Amino acid sequence: MFHCIAASIGVAFQNMTNNPDQKNVILLLTRPEGGNERFCLNIEHLLGQCEILDSPLQKIEFLETLIEVKEESILIFTSINGLRASEKYNLRNKKCFVVGENTRKIATSAGYEVLASSSDQENLLKLIKLKNPTESMVHIRGKHTTGNLCDSLKNNGFSCFEITGYNQQPLKIKKQIFHKVKSGRPVILPIFSLIKLLLLIYTASAPEIISINSLVMKA
């Protein structure tokens, strides 16, 4: 059975480690390659309070595209993988909108002018409407996503099209990690997307789930 809490990772640790019955906490990290390492950098002060288990639930497969992207178009990255996919297309575009602080940092270091950034697609749409760009926009996204930002932009009078830049291939939880998760120890599992939640339900169960992305709780 799942117990979901919309909270920060710090609140999750406080709730579980303050309870004398909740010992030997497991932090289960399920992001694709590179994602778990980036996440740990943001919570280094908490890592000594738990055992970290690394078991990605997705393998990212980058896809080729025959779609021509005009150099003056504004790119939209709603994930780091969208940005990584664009690098494989050797695009010369200089401006972008992004979702996520890490995505913003990487885009900036790659030479992009980040016109606006937000924590989720819903708020990014609001920011784009405020910026009111006249250029065409290109959303480089994964095959499986929540919501449709491009359609929302077109419905608001903007020019936008999509490129499916990568596929998220499902992976099962590693067998040895699955046994630890099922051992009865308290588990904190950060969830960043509805897709990740559905994959988890398909593969295993955990006694405690902390939702980082508020959109997951609305699903």
Segments (PLM) and residue ranges:
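Signature of uroporphyrinogen-III synthase
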Residues: 13-219
